[in-house]
Amino acid sequence: MSEVERSPEIDRFRGLAIVLMVFANYFAGISWVPAWLKHAPDIGFTCIDVIAPLFIFAIALTYGASYRRSIASRGRRETALRFVRRYAALVGIGAILSAGEVWFEQGQGAMNWGVLQAIGVAGLLALCFMGFSPWIRLLAGGLILVVYQILLDRFWLEIVLDSSHGGFPGSISWGGMLIIASGIADLINGKGEERAPTGCKKIATSEPKIVALKFIAAGLIFVAMGAALGQLIPISKNRVSATYDILSIGISAVIYGLASSSFGLRKWSGKMRVSDGSAMSNSKITQYRQYGPITQFLVWWGRNPIFLYILHLFVLGIFALPTAPWWYTNAHPALAVFQFLFIVGILTSIARALYQKKIIINL
């Protein structure tokens, strides 16, 4: 994998998103967990509602760079086929898992439209816009959200509310979120500024602190926009409303900026040494970062995020499938914490082993 894709900051962010997904999915089935630690039933926003957008944002951080590298090495046709296969595979895997869920529930209810299907369709939609500049992606993503919101309010509301993650129509909104987030990431990371409007050509920088601050600043702008528009359009994860997308993009950008700049930071700067052991000249002093065990733990998870997400669904089944209420639904807090730590421990052991063996499982 390339240096961009294997950026420790992005791996840590991916890992954080997946760990939080495991937390949300496990405790969603526990009866005594308070409402603010579960998804809002419809209109409203809880801290859990931002977890899926965190992973969408993590995908957006490398989508554009990965697409451009693939174009350079494989050409446009092979690149398009590669990305179509990747995201179509997510839809297919998600459908198989959803069918298995229906089978275990003995056919009760409709087949679930899961996170993997939503990400897969969003990725396919975003692929149509990856060849455009970040500024065009920002505009296109915004237009998609506007059109989706109109269709939602006039035609799709009942269908979307009857489906998890908004069903197929909701995936259009997730796609708009991914397109906008990729535009933000490429602008700040320095891709596309050559085609930016004259007054905006100096957005990008390679300075880590400044990059982090710009993600935070961009995030706060989107948070303010989402909160303001929320007075007109309900903020709802279940509806995947435009205001939910805008607010979630903002929160995700702020969290990424904070995490990449300071989370687990022990040391920020120092002199690097060249291969012969001599100190670099003052003009070549390079900043570096050293991280503690918590952030290293997240890097393990972030190396194979999709694989660990799929795997956690099977491990979660050990606790969620038995029907005895005391075992899961009404589990004692101590038992629930033990079960959650067991799931995290198993997955961390696997994540660490894959990391140490330098195994990366891609679709």
Task: Show the residue positions of the predicted features.
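Alpha-helical transmembrane segments and their immediate juxtamembrane cytosolic regions
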Residues: 1-363
